[in-house]
Amino acid sequence: MEGENNMEKGLLLAKKEDSANTTPLLIFSTFIIVSASFTFGAAIGYTADTMSSIMSDLDLSLAQFSLFGSLSTFGGMIGAIFSAKAASAFGHKMTLWVADLFCITGWLAISLAKDIIWLDMGRFLVGIGVGLISYVVPVYIAEITPKHVRGAFTFSNQLLQNCGVAVVYYFGNFLSWRTLAIIGSIPCWIQVIGLFFIPESPRWLAKKGRDKECEEVLQKLRGRKYDIVPEACEIKISVEASKKNSNINIRSLFEKRYAHQLTIGIGLMLLQQLCGTAGISSYGSTLFKLAGFPARIGMMVLSLIVVPKSLMGLILVDRWGRRPLLMTSALGLCLSCITLAVAFGVKDVPGIGKITPIFCFIGILSFTMMFAIGMGALPWIIMSEIFPMDIKVLAGSLVTIANWFTGWIANYAFNFMLVWSPSGTFIISAIICGATIVFTWCLVPETRRLTLEEIQLSFVNV
């Protein structure tokens, strides 16, 4: 209780602070950190338009390609196991250097692959890299940004992911799958160099007892004229409170005091992966062909709209708030899945089946747009905000593993579900999207314009 009272006093001091400036260092640091998110997006979208050419060039069966497609998510699960612990022990920057090494090696292995072994190994290594990236990037951004722009800056993670998706969608129509793999590695090289010029997270420095460095970095991030004393005090009090709970273990996560945060974190990650995005992002070209719509046109249109819609989400996240944007996104996804279910459901019906191509196009287009403005980024943003420092490592690892494990299953199963029933597949997705609305309404709190410590204290006072 004493730690909680001290935190409340610190928050009273912090509330007196003015809005911090958005400094060049803050913008540059965010850009360098999210450059790896481009590789994350490229890995997600890589199989969407390369399926037929890879299967033809390397003589793969559907099962072999499905395994290849799912290996990035399996590798991501392995990376996720170590992501939070590595970031806590060695820092966010060092963890990202290791992630870049995995991604660069993996993309090169794919581009040079002569058989299924090198192809699968490369995909698995990329997966480990993006598994590390998936946790570190949103957490680092949340820890360096002031509360009034935290949502927008953290949303840039999703924006760069969508840029990666858009690039492989668009250039997949013209370039070979080997060249696309090389393109996927370029942002990692940028980050490898850029990490030398950005600071470590102030909260990580404070946790390691490097208080002077914490204050120096905080001053650089906020601007010379900004009074960092209230925020630095808030961070120190939070660190002190977490040290009093240093005996936290995996069992502690399931105690009543953490149940709400853990339910939100894991729940949103499961709903994100099961809403249908694994199939649409990875096998969009296959869906267009199945519906009789020109796959090249469909993929080019998707590549052009996904980034502008992400920009819309970036603008709205700190204006509307997390809850309204998440529920709006989930509603749009639900309607999109219903549209796709209808499109494939009437495909073989005489006289009505001709609407399948255009309905499929509308469904995939609207799904991609609605996912980009909310459901793609918000689970990661909320995950980076809700866990207190004493359980952030364990909870972050568990939540990230849950995301990747579910994604692996969904990605591998999608092709087989399409063989079973395209319409039935999207009916299931629509139900899950509807459940997301109810879940958000009942359990997810609004975190807009609150500091990380204020958010975490709000769960204590529930």
From Swiss-Prot:
Sugar transporter. It is a multi-pass membrane protein. This is Sugar transporter ERD6-like 12. Keywords: Membrane, Sugar transport, Transmembrane, Transmembrane helix, Transport. GO terms for molecular function: sugar transmembrane transporter activity. One of its GO terms (cellular component) is membrane. The keyword Transmembrane applies. The gene is SUGTL5. The chain crosses the membrane at residues 25-45, 62-82, 101-121, 124-144, 151-171, 179-199, 262-282, 297-317, 326-346, 358-378, 399-419, 424-444. It is found in: Membrane. CDD domains: MFS_GLUT6_8_Class3_like. Belongs to the major facilitator superfamily. Sugar transporter (TC 2.A.1.1) family. PANTHER family: PTHR48021, SUGAR TRANSPORTER ERD6-LIKE 12.
